[in-house]
Swiss-Prot record:
One of its GO terms (cellular component) is nucleus. It comes from Morone saxatilis (Striped bass). Residues 202-261 bind DNA. This is Homeobox protein Hox-A9. The gene is hoxa9. Pfam families: Homeodomain, Hox9_act.
Length: 269
């Protein structure tokens, strides 16, 4: 009995003790030794696959940007502003440790930067209005100075120039008076707007038949008042006429005969 009792207590203790140990000790210890063992085991398990190598990629950005001078040459536009953000250089390039202020300062010059998309207007060099005045009024010497144009003042013409301009205007009016007056009827006929009032008829001019042609047609009409198509073709070929001309002549000749029969014989007879 004592032997069996000790065995039962041993088995009971062996069954109960692991549960109590599980409560006090964490189920998955995370010691460095265990992690190293797991890593070595995983490496040994997949050692037959080999290592993976990736090609090196080029850097996204190029080398560092060079220092941009604060003052640009005079060929750069003073009113150009790109619609994209301006890249800023490295902070260390400035001796004072502050950002460059040339991005916010206006640049000198009046020429546009070619090759860059923009919708801004550029400064245009104002033309001297003297060339336009010379083209409009030949012989005049009036011109606007660029300084006067910028200040908003206009130079007035001298009395001599006024006399010259008035003389030119008088010559132009005299030439207009010397021209002979146009006939109003001819001017209306030449005017394309009123041309339809005097338009000629669209019909072709009447081409009279020769005596020989009329004689032959009269002979044919005495024999046949109506012509067949074949006979009309033969008559037209013999008289050097078209079939339409022969047909129209026979129609007119029949109408004339009907009118003569309707009116009756002349009273003189």
């Amino acid at each position: 009995m004592s032997t069996s009792g000790t065995l039962t207590s041993y088995y009971v203790d062996s069954l109960i003790l692991p549960e109590s140990e599980e409560l006090s000790v964490p189920r998955y210890p995370s010691g460095p030794g265990l992690q190293h063992a797991r890593q070595s085991a995983s490496i040994s398990d997949h050692s037959e696959l080999g290592t993976c190598t990736f090609p090196s990629k080029p850097p996204v950005f190029g080398p560092s940007w060079s220092h941009v001078p604060a003052q640009f040459p005079g060929t750069v536009s003073s009113v150009y502003h790109h619609h994209y953000g301006h890249p800023q250089g490295p902070v260390g390039a400035d001796t004072d440790g502050r950002y460059q202020s040339w991005l916010l300062e206006p640049m000198s010059g009046s020429l546009p930067m070619a090759g860059l998309p923009t919708t801004h207007h550029y400064g245009i060099k104002p033309e001297g209005l003297g060339t336009r005045a010379d083209g409009a009024l030949p012989g005049s010497h009036t011109a606007l100075l660029l300084s006067d144009y910028a200040n908003g003042t206009v130079a007035t013409a001298s009395p001599v120039e006024k006399d010259t301009l008035s003389g030119q205007a008088g010559d132009v009016s005299g030439e207009a008076e010397e021209k002979p007056g146009l006939d109003p009827s001819k001017s209306l006929q030449n005017n394309p707007v009123s041309n339809w009032l005097h338009a000629s008829a669209t019909r072709k001019k009447r081409c009279p038949y020769t005596k020989h042609q009329i004689l032959e047609l009269e002979k044919e009409f005495l024999f046949n008042t109506y012509l067949t198509r074949d006979r009309r073709y033969e008559v037209a070929r013999l008289l050097n006429l078209t079939e339409r001309q022969v047909k129209i002549w026979f129609q007119n000749r029949r109408m004339k005969m009907k009118k003569f029969n309707k009116d009756g014989a002349p009273k003189d007879e």
